[in-house]
């Protein structure tokens, strides 16, 4: 069975599913396929695990490559999950780039909501040299936070508080949820254990469907990545994040621009200078909106965009 899912825009009430074909009008650039890898030594494919091989941060002030040249990490593509879980060390660097802060009171990573207006991107590459690169805009990563009374919390300098849709994975699998997948046009070839990715065209209005030639045929209109860097999925566990609440007092801070990161100042361009340093804020009964994630089993094939 071959199929793809695309959630056209963040505010969309529905995505779309196409069985047995590719809609070449719904993406930009090249559609490039990579291998899907089995879990551990079982040789069974129980999740959509691919080789994630590079991450860069690009802003108006430059580009930083955040991974080594031989980097390869098993990553699950899962549309049943809202957020993206990155290896802890890489997540820390991303937070430095974006000026994000881990809030223990909320159990969330927080940023000023104005970050969604920033034109910078996080650029993910898969399958090694020649593999697909997906650019994720800040607007896809910033999620709302509201109080139990429906109010939007603010920092003391007046800026509203939002959640960043990226968290450290800890002992959980590295997982790319909706905050990544909204930016990707994805084709799932379950017959050949391949996944093809391209950049989503958010402005697409037409359709051009190309069918698979036959059962077991390669993904139409797609080229194959080198897949020189193979991976094995060994991590287990299910993220369960949702309905998070916090009581008591906390401190919200804007991180100063990180040293040694060229792109960081570009991501900081929308921040008020008054935001630097400690910004006291009472996190009384704050809840994270639009975040309810649970990693689902994938043995029978399913997908549902939130």
Protein language model regions, located:
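Active-site or ligand-binding cleft "flap/edge" segments
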Residues: 1-204, 208
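Aspartic protease catalytic domain
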Residues: 125-297, 301-306
């Amino acid at each position: 069975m071959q199929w793809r899912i695309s959630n056209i825009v963040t505010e969309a009430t529905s995505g779309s599913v196409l069985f047995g074909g590719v809609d070449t009008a719904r993406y930009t650039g090249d559609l490039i396929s990579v291998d899907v890898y089995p879990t551990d030594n079982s040789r069974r494919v129980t999740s959509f695990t691919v080789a994630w091989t590079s991450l860069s941060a690009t802003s108006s002030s430059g580009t930083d490559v955040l991974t080594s040249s031989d980097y390869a990490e098993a990553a699950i593509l899962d549309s049943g999950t809202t957020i993206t879980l990155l290896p802890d060390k890489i997540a820390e660097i991303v937070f430095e780039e974006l000026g994000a802060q881990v809030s223990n009171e909320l159990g969330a990573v927080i940023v000023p909501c104005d970050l969604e207006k920033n034109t910078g991107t996080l650029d993910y590459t898969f399958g090694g040299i020649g593999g697909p690169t997906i650019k994720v805009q800040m607007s896809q990563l910033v999620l709302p936070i509201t109080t139990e009374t429906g109010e939007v919390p603010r920092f003391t300098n007046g800026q509203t508080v939002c959640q960043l849709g990226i968290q450290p994975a800890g002992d959980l699998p590295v997982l790319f949820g909706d905050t990544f997948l909204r930016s990707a046009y994805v084709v799932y070839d379950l017959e050949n254990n391949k996944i093809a990715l391209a950049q989503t065209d958010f402005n697409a209005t037409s359709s051009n469907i190309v069918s698979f030639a036959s059962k077991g045929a390669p993904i139409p209109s797609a080229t194959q990545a080198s897949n020189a860097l193979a991976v094995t999925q060994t991590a287990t566990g299910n993220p369960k994040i949702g309905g998070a609440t916090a009581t008591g007092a906390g401190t919200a801070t804007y991180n100063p621009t990180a040293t040694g990161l060229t792109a960081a100042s570009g991501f900081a361009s929308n921040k008020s200078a008054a935001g630097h340093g400690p910004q006291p804020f009472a996190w009384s009964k704050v809840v994270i909106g639009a975040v309810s994630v649970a990693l689902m089993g994938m043995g029978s094939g399913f997908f549902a965009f939130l």
